[in-house]
């Protein structure tokens, strides 16, 4: 369970941390360097993801990308839509599909920052507007890895002679960063993650511009108000802010590893960051030899892998108050002994005592069909603003067949996921605004289903969650949740 101790103080009593000389002192130093940044990341994201003063150059780039995307859509689709009179027959569906097509093409033209937003949209099933999720999955956006020559220059500027060499080819990469094998000056093999050049500046500018665009769309297109696109802009900004400073990667890895150690999770290995080698643009960690999850997931034992993945997300969140909040194939590896390994933890979910109790109470309410209890849980988490008709919200939840416990649980994981999606739609319709950490937690549950499907088509999320479900009464008693 989380405590008032700092991460360094908790690491000081950890067997996992003791293996790396100097790690505890390094953690204390990293905490001092970015304490204010880490504690205010949600507020910073909220400020950026609001309409405000726009950066001139990036705004011009965004405007050009939007005009090109709109022109491409008009040339390819508008004549057919006019001929079929879709805007008259299906105005809401036509508006959503058209906006999704244009925005997806605009993200392509915005480069790596746009690709990262698309990736976050893809991961946010049930939370991001569904028409956007469908579009980026139908037409995925990818970016190539940064050249090895550039990576070596970044590492040399960051760490000088401390890192002797870095492999040209990345083990894995995302629009934000990439991971390479490397060798320290003393011959020790490590893994080095570097931030993509310029991504931090583009991300800051794009957040403000996208917020202005999302606000305008909410006002001009009624069909887009219910999904609350501004809320998604805030979610994406929060995640990208944390990912952009790789000192967070070092601290997140330590926090996750301490939770794994305390919970006794044996099916996953978390590498230790190397003391003295963590800066905003680069970080070095222990070398974890393995194969990318994307190509080797089918070789895992489904049950053991499911326990490990649930352990670092749902179980860690409810028991320890921290969880891996960006669990995607690029952040996982498969070891030769059949275990998983963490190759990246750029985003860590951190519950306050109130959000932790709220999440626990909500899950218990879902399983028992206590809809009033579910709304009380959301109030406890700070998700229900003033002016919400609570009684009507409870009635709407209770009147939805797909949210009844028997309907959600008897149909397997697909029924459960469909129920969560229905619940999100109802909550947004009532203008609920859950804290970002709760949104990240819900998103992690959807990510689990996707990862388990890669391991085995027969893997079932509900079965994997049962050990945690069985612990809910004890956790409720521990946290005084009624």
Feature locations, PLM:
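ATP-dependent phospho-/nucleotidyl transfer catalytic cores
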Residues: 130, 137-144, 156, 204-205, ...
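Glycine-rich ATP phosphate-binding loop
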Residues: 188-195
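Helix-rich C-lobe and terminal helical cap/extension of kinase-like folds
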Residues: 10, 15-38, 42-53, 93, ...
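Hydrophobic residue at the +6 position relative to the catalytic HRD Asp in the kinase catalytic loop
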Residues: 330-334
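Residue-level signature of catalytic and energy-coupling elements of molecular machines
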Residues: 118, 179, 192, 249, ...
């Amino acid at each position: 369970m989380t405590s008032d101790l700092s991460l360094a103080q908790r690491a000081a009593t950890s067997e996992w941390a003791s293996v790396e000389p100097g790690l505890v002192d390094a953690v204390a130093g990293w905490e001092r360097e970015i304490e204010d940044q880490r504690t205010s990341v949600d507020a910073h994201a909220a400020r950026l993801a609001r309409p405000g003063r726009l950066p001139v150059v990036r705004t011009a780039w965004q405007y050009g990308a939007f005009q090109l995307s709109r022109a491409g859509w008009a040339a390819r689709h508008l004549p057919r839509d006019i001929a079929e009179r879709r805007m008259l027959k299906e105005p809401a569906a036509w508006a959503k599909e058209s906006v999704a097509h244009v925005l997806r093409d605009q993200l392509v033209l915005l480069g790596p920052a746009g690709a990262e937003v698309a990736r976050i949209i893809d991961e946010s099933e049930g939370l991001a507007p569904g028409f956007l999720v469908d579009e980026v999955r139908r037409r995925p956006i990818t970016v190539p890895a940064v050249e090895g020559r550039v990576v070596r220059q970044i590492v040399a500027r960051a760490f000088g002679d401390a890192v002797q060499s870095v492999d040209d080819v990345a083990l894995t990469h995302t629009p934000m960063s990439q991971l390479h094998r490397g060798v320290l000056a003393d011959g020790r093999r490590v893994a080095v993650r570097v931030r993509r050049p310029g991504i931090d500046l583009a991300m800051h500018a794009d957040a403000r511009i996208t917020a202005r665009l999302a606000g305008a769309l909410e006002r001009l297109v009624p069909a887009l108000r219910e999904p609350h696109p501004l809320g998604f802009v805030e979610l994406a900004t929060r995640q990208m802010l944390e990912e952009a400073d790789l000192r967070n990667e070092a601290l997140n890895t330590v926090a996750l590893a301490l939770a794994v150690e305390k919970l006794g999770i044996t099916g996953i290995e978390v590498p230790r960051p190397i003391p003295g080698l963590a800066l905003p643009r680069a970080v070095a960690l222990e070398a974890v030899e393995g194969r990318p999850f994307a190509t080797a997931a089918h070789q895992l034992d489904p049950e053991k892998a499911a326990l490990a993945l649930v352990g670092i997300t749902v179980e860690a969140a409810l028991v320890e108050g921290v969880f891996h909040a960006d669990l995607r194939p690029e952040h996982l590896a498969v070891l030769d002994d059949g275990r998983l390994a963490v190759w990246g933890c750029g985003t860590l979910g951190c519950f306050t005592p109130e959000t932790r109790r709220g999440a626990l109470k909500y899950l218990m309410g879902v399983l028992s069909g206590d809809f009033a209890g579910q709304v009380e849980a959301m109030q406890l988490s700070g998700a229900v603003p003033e002016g919400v008709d609570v009684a009507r919200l409870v009635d709407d939840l209770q009147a939805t067949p797909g949210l009844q416990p028997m309907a959600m649980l008897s149909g397997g994981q697909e029924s459960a996921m469909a129920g969560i999606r229905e619940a999100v739609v109802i909550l947004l319709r009532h203008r609920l605004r859950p804290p970002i950490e709760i949104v990240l937690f819900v998103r992690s549950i959807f990510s689990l289903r996707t990862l388990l499907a890669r391991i085995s088509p027969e893997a079932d999320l509900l079965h994997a969650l049962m050990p945690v479900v069985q612990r809910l009464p004890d956790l409720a008693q521990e946290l005084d949740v009624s």
